[in-house]
């Protein structure tokens, strides 16, 4: 509708040469803004340490910025400080996903949600969490935020793979992991994107601007003399869809590859290096090499390592170990790191 309205206004108020100029300008501005929003898929690392308090790392917490909508994955203590340090807008946070009920992954919820109340948030906030977690935190919030400025909703997640969230842009699936308590991973997956307009071709065939959205959805164009111009003549292929798999605390668990197939990016915990493989198995954690092996099994293109044990003063050994078992790109999580997942 907006395209059609712009087209009508331009025809009524501008001469032909002016019309051509403004026509091209409006197309450029609208297309650039839409492309910018469509492409945004950023990962912000707020915390990548393990359970033991450390001066080097904060507890687990990540934020995905998908088309200017924020999704938090796990919420370690002082998550609101990470928000402030990375200049993220709290009012854009509408969903929080909690993988399991160990404190380093969920004890940040009370502080974060109280901060949102202090900021006079009004829109509802959904916490995706298992039934036990919903029971525990509902009691807490009913006491401390009974007269809060916004509504807190709980979406209960089970132990089987399932789609737990969907909007126009993405789906979010949960899948089981292997830890000492029930633990879920999360798979964020973009829906198919729109095709790109070929500016020179739509001008050549004089396609009205209000039909551009139809073209981006795959429609052909019929000229006034009833000639059908195939869509592929007027548009080019859409960008590839991005997917991000988050594997929270878990022992080595090859069945992850049954749920996660060929993700663009995978985050996998790597609490230890090979030296402490036995300890990792005992505590339900993974080594960097095991994380890399899971990434290989899933067919991932890129691997991010995190959840580092306090005993290490450097994580370079994690990266070296993972690169021996994974052919793709390996990155180390670190507080303050922002990754453009489209690249």
For every predicted segment, state its role.
Residues 3, 7-10, 15-72, 199, ...:
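Zn-dependent metallo-beta-lactamase
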């Amino acid at each position: 509708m907006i395209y059609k309205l712009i087209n009508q206004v331009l025809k009524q108020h501008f001469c032909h040469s002016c019309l051509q100029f403004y026509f091209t300008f409006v197309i450029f501005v609208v297309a650039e803004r839409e492309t910018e929003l469509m492409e945004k898929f950023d990962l912000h690392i707020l915390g990548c340490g393990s359970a033991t308090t450390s001066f080097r790392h904060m507890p687990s917490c990540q934020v995905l910025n998908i088309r200017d909508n924020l999704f938090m994955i796990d919420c370690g203590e002082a998550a609101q400080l990470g928000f402030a340090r990375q200049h993220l807008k709290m009012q854009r946070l509408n969903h929080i996903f909690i993988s399991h009920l160990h404190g380093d992954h969920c004890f940040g919820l009370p502080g974060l949600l109280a901060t949102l109340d202090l900021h006079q948030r009004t829109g509802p906030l959904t916490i995706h969490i298992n039934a036990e977690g919903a029971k525990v935190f509902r009691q807490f919030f009913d006491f401390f935020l009974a007269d809060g400025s916004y509504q807190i909703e709980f979406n209960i997640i089970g132990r089987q793979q399932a789609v737990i969230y969907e909007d126009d842009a993405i789906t979010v699936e949960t899948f089981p992991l292997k830890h000492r308590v029930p633990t879920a991973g999360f798979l964020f997956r973009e829906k198919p994107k729109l095709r790109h307009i070929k500016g020179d071709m739509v001008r050549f065939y004089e396609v009205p601007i209000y039909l551009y959205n139809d073209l981006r959805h795959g429609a052909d164009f019929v000229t006034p003399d009833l000639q059908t111009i195939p869509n592929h003549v007027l548009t080019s292929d859409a960008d590839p869809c991005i997917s991000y798999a988050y594997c929270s605390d878990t022992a080595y668990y090859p069945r992850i590859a049954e749920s996660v197939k060929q993700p663009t990016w995978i985050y996998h915990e790597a609490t230890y290096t090979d030296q402490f493989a036995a300890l990792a198995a005992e505590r339900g954690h993974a080594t960097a090499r095991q994380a890399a092996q899971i990434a290989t099994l899933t067919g991932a293109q890129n691997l991010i390592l995190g959840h580092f044990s306090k005993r290490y003063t450097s994580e370079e050994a994690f990266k070296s170990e993972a690169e021996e078992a994974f052919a793709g790109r390996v990155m180390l999580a670190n507080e303050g790191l922002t990754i453009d997942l489209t690249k």
